[in-house]
Each structure stands twice: as structure tokens, then as C-alpha cells.
Amino acid sequence: MISHHVIGTLIQAYFTIFHVTYPLIHEETFKAQCHGTRSRPYQRSWDTLFYAVLGVGAWCLDNEDNAFDERLYRRALFLGEDESIFETANLSLVQALLLLSNLSQKRNKPNTGWNCLGLAKRMASSLGLHRELSEWNISPFQREMRRRVWWSLYMFDSSASTTFGRATLLPGREVMDVSYVSNVSDEVGYLLPRLCNIG
């Protein structure tokens, strides 16, 4: 069992260090889901995402407790092995797989990372994240989060392909019509009003 204090420290490390480069999770939403003040997506997917965030947070702290880091990483992977979570693609699971892919590479497990990235790509395509889908009736906030996840996936895939000399998994720009992410902050009360004025 991990104490609330340690969980808070790991989540803060994730958002302070990792999130500034890869803003694929909305900080205030994630923290509200952690505290139970906002509903969580499909439980198993969210649990996988939760432990992936903790694992990346532990890695960001760069402490010498590799056993703890490894335990969090393995817990997230274990939750991701439940085949029922693969029956329905969802944004939380794509986010979790992206984090697991990145963390696997950091842990010198490039093949595991590559395979997690492949699963994330297929789920993202199933969800249509590569398309703007302007006819969909979703909020500007939801649309922005879809863009963030897609372009984070794009960056991870490009980086992994270059690093390992493997073919990119993603389609070329001619197949994608998703817009780039908006340059807005995740601060409370800032992202949503700004996105409501876009367009």
C-alpha cells in the first residue's frame, strides 16, 4: 500500500517534470479523479493510467529506489494485461500505453516500449484521434485532449522510430486532418475558458 503522501509526491513529480514536455493528461482533471471529486473513465483503464503516472513520477524523482520504481511499472503493466480493457478503446488507456511505452524505453526495455506504442497507435486510430471530426458533438476541451494525446503519440512514435531505426507506425500528414494542439495552460480556470473562445 502506498501512502497518500507518496502518491501526491509522485503525481506532483510527474506534472512538474514530465508533463511540461508531454502534456497528454490534463492535470486538474487527473487530480480531481484521484481525489474522487470527478468521475473516472472505465476503472481498469484509469487504474492503469494512475500507476503509469506514478511510475513516471518515480522515474522523474531519480531516486535510488529502483525496486519501488519497478513495482509501480510492473503494476501498470499487469493492469494493462487484462484483455477486457482491450475490448473498448478509450483515451485513458491510450494515455497509459503511451506512458508505459516511454517508461519501458527509460527502463531499457525497448521492445516492450515499442509494443506498448503499437497498441496505443491502434487504439488511437480506432478512436479517430488522427481526425478532427468537426461534425462530432464534443466539447472544445474534449477535442483539445484528443489532439494532445494524438500529437504526443506522434512525437513518441517519431522519436522511437529514429532511436531504434524502425519504421514509423503513424500515417503521413496527408491521412491526418487533426489540428495541432492549442498553446494554452492547464491551470485551473484557464484551459476551459480559453478553449471555449477558440474557433
Where are these regions (language model features)?
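Short sequence/structural elements of tandem HEAT/ARM alpha-solenoid repeats
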Residues: A67-R71, N115, G172
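Short, electropositive, low-hydrophobicity segments enriched in small/polar residues
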Residues: V56-W59, T112, E132, L169
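Extended, hydrophobic/aromatic-rich amphipathic alpha-helical segments that build helical scaffolds
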Residues: A96-L99, C116-A120, V149-S152
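Fungal transcription factor middle regulatory core
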Residues: A13, G36, R74-L79, A124-G199
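Classical protein tyrosine phosphatase
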Residues: R107-M123
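C-terminal transcriptional activation/regulatory domains of eukaryotic transcription factors
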Residues: M1-S92, L97-K109, W136-F141
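Short alpha-helical scaffold segments that flank and stabilize functional sites
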Residues: A58-L61, L79, L99, C116, ...
